[in-house]
């Protein structure tokens, strides 16, 4: 009898380990505050600096993991959308966005897209200098393999008017075009919005063009960047003062930033 119970216990433990070791998608979530909101300030205009960066979990092209290098690249930005952000590591208790926010004195929000061993594993994040009154994380489907995706929408209060910041990291269109449709549909809901992220597709790809709101402006288009780039800053209801980038090195992606002005 003891042998039977031992066998059942081993099977149960094996089942738990199997389930925990699988990568699971996270459902949608919403909230009204970011971590460390005391770091935010009132927007006094007239312009703000916005960046997007796939940080590759802070692993550089030299193979070293160095989050401080990422912090140096993005310092000076008012709002930064990050992709491929790592969740809490064993013993640390904090995700990479939390550390970046602490070093740069910015409010931080980690939007995990998947969990591993029952804990948030990887996802996207936002660092913001201005108050955020609302955020919503939306799971995107279909997802393939371990690449679960999401879209997070933030309402940022600037000069008494809401500006919506959308951050995402999409799989290649060949793995499913529905996420592109969902992201562009959400982007089109807001008259003043900034869509940032890694789209794994250039601007002229049919999946980008098909659902893009007609009044969308590619904020990086006139800066002479590679037309095949997949990292985007798309805007509606704002104008571009200037755009710039930092090369790969701290990550396997370049960092892109723009200075925007409210219309």
For the regions a language model picked out, list residue spans one by one.
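Active-site-proximal alpha/beta segments of enzymes that process anionic O-linked groups
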Residues: 98
């Amino acid at each position: 009898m003891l042998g039977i119970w031992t066998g059942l216990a081993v099977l149960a433990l094996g089942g738990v380990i199997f389930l925990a070791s699988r990568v699971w998608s996270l459902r949608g979530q919403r909230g009204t505050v970011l971590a460390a909101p005391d770091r935010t300030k009132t927007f006094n205009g007239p312009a703000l600096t916005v960046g997007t960066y796939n940080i590759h979990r802070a692993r550089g092209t030299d193979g070293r993991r160095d989050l401080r290098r990422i912090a140096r690249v993005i310092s000076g930005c008012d709002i930064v959308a990050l992709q491929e952000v790592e969740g809490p590591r064993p013993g640390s208790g904090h995700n990479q966005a939390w550390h970046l926010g602490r070093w740069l004195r910015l409010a931080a929000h980690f939007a995990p897209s998947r969990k591993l061993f029952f804990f948030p594993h990887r996802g996207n994040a936002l660092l913001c200098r201005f108050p955020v009154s609302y955020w919503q994380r939306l799971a995107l489907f279909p997802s393939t393999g371990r690449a679960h995706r999401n879209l997070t929408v933030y309402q940022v209060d600037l000069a008494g008017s809401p500006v919506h910041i959308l951050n995402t990291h999409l799989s290649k269109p060949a793995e499913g075009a529905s996420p592109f449709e969902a992201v562009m549909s959400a982007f089109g809901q807001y008259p003043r919005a900034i869509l940032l992220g890694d789209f794994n597709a250039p601007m002229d790809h049919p999946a980008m063009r098909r659902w893009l709101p007609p009044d969308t402006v590619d904020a990086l288009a006139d800066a002479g960047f590679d037309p095949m780039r997949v990292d985007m800053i798309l805007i509606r209801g704002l104008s571009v003062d200037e755009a710039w980038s930092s090369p790969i090195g701290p990550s396997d992606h370049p960092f892109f930033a723009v200075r925007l002005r409210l219309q």
